C-alpha cells in the first residue's frame, strides 16, 4: 500500500450499489480510503451538508455520477463550488458533450464514461488531487 495514499480519503457518490462498491474497491486497491454514498442528499447529510461535509470528512477527491436520484451530480458540484470543494471527478453513463462541458466549466478535474477501467479512474484521481 502506498503510505501517502493511505492518508487520502475519497468520497464516491453513485446510486448503483454495485458500481459504488466497484469504485470503492478500485481506489482502495491503490491504498486510498473510500466512503460511498447512494445520493447527493446522503453525502450532504453526512456531516452538516455543503462544504462542511467535505471538511469534516477530510475528502481529498469526490467521485460523482451525474444521474442521481433527487439532486444530480452536476447540481451537487455547483452547490459545493460556493466554498472550497475537493477536486471532482465525474464517472457517468451520461457522458454527453453538454454534461462534460458543464462539469469542466464548474471545475471538474476529470470526466470519465462508464464503464470505467480501474487504472483509468486511478489516473484521474491522482491527477485531480493536488500534490
Q: Predicted segment positions?
A:
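Two-component/phosphorelay signaling modules centered on CheY-like receiver
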Residues: 17-35
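Short amphipathic alpha-helix used as the core "switch/output" element in two-component signaling
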Residues: 72-84
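Alpha4 helix (beta4-alpha4-beta5 surface) of REC/receiver domains from two-component response regulators
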Residues: 75, 95-110
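Active-site beta3 strand of CheY-like receiver
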Residues: 50-63, 68
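The feature encodes the CheY-like receiver
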Residues: 20, 57, 69, 96, ...
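Acidic catalytic/metal-coordinating carboxylates
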Residues: 38-39, 58-60, 72-75
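C-terminal output helix
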Residues: 98, 116-125
Amino acid at each position: 500500500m502506498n503510505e501517502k495514499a493511505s492518508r487520502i480519503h475519497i468520497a464516491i457518490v453513485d446510486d448503483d450499489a454495485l458500481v459504488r462498491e466497484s469504485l470503492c474497491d478500485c481506489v482502495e486497491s491503490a491504498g486510498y480510503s473510500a466512503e460511498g454514498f447512494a445520493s447527493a442528499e446522503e453525502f450532504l447529510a453526512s456531516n452538516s451538508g455543503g462544504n462542511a461535509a467535505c471538511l469534516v470528512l477530510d475528502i481529498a477527491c469526490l467521485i460523482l455520477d451525474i444521474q442521481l436520484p433527487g439532486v444530480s451530480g452536476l447540481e451537487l458540484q455547483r452547490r459545493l463550488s460556493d466554498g472550497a470543494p475537493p477536486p471532482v471527478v465525474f464517472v457517468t453513463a451520461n457522458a454527453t458533450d453538454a454534461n462534460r462541458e458543464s462539469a469542466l466549466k464548474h471545475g471538474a478535474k476529470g470526466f470519465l464514461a462508464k464503464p470505467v477501467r480501474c487504472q483509468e479512474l486511478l489516473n484521474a484521481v491522482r491527477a485531480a488531487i493536488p500534490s
